[in-house]
Amino acid sequence: MSNTKDTSTEDRIKAAARKVFHQKGFAGTRTRDIAEEAGINHAMLNYYFRSKEKLFEIVMMETMGQFFKGVGVILNDESTSLEEKIERVVANYSDLLLEEPDLPTFMFNEVRANPEPFVANTPILQALEHSVLARQYAEAVAQGRITEPNLMHTVLNVISLVIFPFIAQPIFTALSRTDKEAYKALMLQRKTLIPQWIKAILFLPNRAE
């Protein structure tokens, strides 16, 4: 076998690994599963990536990057209001999860099993605390415009409303006999509704910008 690695093959392996890891998690995935998904033999997989652990580390880092990509720009945009930032964060994650519905279950399961790499490589709370959004939120509290002084409650509400329906999709669709297309339509409706709900909970009447 040549010592020159083909980047297209490497990318194909990573794409296959991403798909399989997202569906089965680290513990449930065999390297043979990834090789089959990539359409290569097991020896070639080992040539490009020496271990399942190494390949998983790459996939996890890329997944976290995708999950938080663009949020920093939204949180620190001086030209948008607090209300607009809420709308954009919801839209950002709704669009991502409609494309990658297995992503939240994968991330939560793997972070729960091994939280240290996530904490070390994703200082999201620190970034949030020093963001333009946090400053705008504090100003809104001081002005008496919003009802909840703790930003973390609002963050958790947004995360829960956006992400939980994707985690609960298998249960909901089975119990309600809803097909995937109908469920996707429901998620698209929520993309518009969630910011309305958050603002209705958060802002005092006639105090939203």
Regions found by a protein language model. Give the residues of each.
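Amphipathic alpha-helical linker/stalk segments
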Residues: S2, V59-R88, L133-Q136
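Hydrophobic/aromatic residues within well-ordered alpha-helical segments
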Residues: K52, V59, T63, F67, ...
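Helix-turn-helix
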Residues: R12, V20-K54, I58
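Amphipathic alpha-helical segments used for helix-helix packing
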Residues: L98-V119, Q169-R177
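Generic hydrophobic, amphipathic alpha-helix propensity
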Residues: T9-R18, I34, V59-F67, L133
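Hydrophobic alpha-helical connector segments
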Residues: V73-T105, Q143, L151-V158, F203-E209
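C-terminal peripheral helix-coil segments that are non-catalytic and often amphipathic
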Residues: N92-D95, E99, A127, S131-Q143, ...
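N-terminal intrinsically disordered/low-complexity leader segments
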Residues: M1-S8, A15, K19, N206-E209
